[in-house]
Amino acid sequence: MFSRATRSLVMKTGGLRTQGTHSPGSAASSSQRRMTPYVDCYAQRSYPMPDEPYCTELSEEQRALKEKEKGSWAQLSQAEKVALYRLQFHETFAEMNHRSNEWKTVMGCVFFFIGFTALVIWWQRVYVFPKKVVTLTEERKAQQLQRLLDMKSNPIQGLSAHWDYEKKEWKK
């Protein structure tokens, strides 16, 4: 692995540096590589109170409000307190935990694809699959049963055992 001298050199310099692809020749600093927990402009429910504020670049009004924050909070109005909160966090807990209406879109897509599948199956039954075989009609099934009974097939335990040949009906 690393020798003791190499390890101490790495620790002193802050680690192995790699050159960025956007700025060849200069090493990327750790502050440039660090990403804030606010990804896609919203606080994550798993990490609701990040170390870094939401707004890092402040305007003149916001800087003045930050200076006023250092004084007594009793002198701040409700709107100023809300503005200070919005500088630190993007959303409140209520906004963060608010349910979205995304389930309606998901259910709509699910029902659309179920309906589309049903239409494809109906189309296949009407136009693709062959017609029913003639031997599956009720008339032909009755003729097949009568033929089995006339041949007296399996007279001990089969169909012929349950048929009364004298009365021409099923035994009760």
UniProtKB/Swiss-Prot annotation:
<dbReference type="InterPro" id="IPR036639">
    <property type="entry name" value="Cyt_c_oxidase_su4_sf"/>
</dbReference>
<keyword id="KW-0809">Transit peptide</keyword>
<dbReference type="GO" id="GO:0045277">
    <property type="term" value="C:respiratory chain complex IV"/>
</dbReference>
<dbReference type="Pfam" id="PF02936">
    <property type="entry name" value="COX4"/>
</dbReference>
<feature type="region of interest" description="Disordered">
    <location>
        <begin position="1"/>
        <end position="33"/>
    </location>
</feature>
<dbReference type="GO" id="GO:0071456">
    <property type="term" value="P:cellular response to hypoxia"/>
</dbReference>
<comment type="pathway">
    <text>Energy metabolism; oxidative phosphorylation.</text>
</comment>
<keyword id="KW-0999">Mitochondrion inner membrane</keyword>
<keyword id="KW-0472">Membrane</keyword>
<dbReference type="InterPro" id="IPR004203">
    <property type="entry name" value="Cyt_c_oxidase_su4_fam"/>
</dbReference>
<keyword id="KW-1133">Transmembrane helix</keyword>
<feature type="topological domain" description="Mitochondrial matrix">
    <location>
        <begin position="19"/>
        <end position="101"/>
    </location>
</feature>
<dbReference type="GO" id="GO:0005743">
    <property type="term" value="C:mitochondrial inner membrane"/>
</dbReference>
<keyword id="KW-0496">Mitochondrion</keyword>
<dbReference type="InterPro" id="IPR013288">
    <property type="entry name" value="Cyt_c_oxidase_su4"/>
</dbReference>
<comment type="similarity">
    <text>Belongs to the cytochrome c oxidase IV family.</text>
</comment>
<feature type="transmembrane region" description="Helical">
    <location>
        <begin position="102"/>
        <end position="127"/>
    </location>
</feature>
<comment type="function">
    <text>Component of the cytochrome c oxidase, the last enzyme in the mitochondrial electron transport chain which drives oxidative phosphorylation. The respiratory chain contains 3 multisubunit complexes succinate dehydrogenase (complex II, CII), ubiquinol-cytochrome c oxidoreductase (cytochrome b-c1 complex, complex III, CIII) and cytochrome c oxidase (complex IV, CIV), that cooperate to transfer electrons derived from NADH and succinate to molecular oxygen, creating an electrochemical gradient over the inner membrane that drives transmembrane transport and the ATP synthase.</text>
</comment>
<comment type="subunit">
    <text>Component of the cytochrome c oxidase (complex IV, CIV), a multisubunit enzyme composed of 14 subunits. The complex is composed of a catalytic core of 3 subunits MT-CO1, MT-CO2 and MT-CO3, encoded in the mitochondrial DNA, and 11 supernumerary subunits COX4I, COX5A, COX5B, COX6A, COX6B, COX6C, COX7A, COX7B, COX7C, COX8 and NDUFA4, which are encoded in the nuclear genome.</text>
</comment>
<protein>
    <recommendedName>
        <fullName>Cytochrome c oxidase subunit 4 isoform 2, mitochondrial</fullName>
    </recommendedName>
</protein>
<feature type="transit peptide" description="Mitochondrion">
    <location>
        <begin position="1"/>
        <end position="18"/>
    </location>
</feature>
<dbReference type="GO" id="GO:0031966">
    <property type="term" value="C:mitochondrial membrane"/>
</dbReference>
<keyword id="KW-0812">Transmembrane</keyword>
<feature type="topological domain" description="Mitochondrial intermembrane">
    <location>
        <begin position="128"/>
        <end position="172"/>
    </location>
</feature>
<dbReference type="GO" id="GO:0006123">
    <property type="term" value="P:mitochondrial electron transport, cytochrome c to oxygen"/>
</dbReference>
<feature type="compositionally biased region" description="Polar residues">
    <location>
        <begin position="16"/>
        <end position="33"/>
    </location>
</feature>
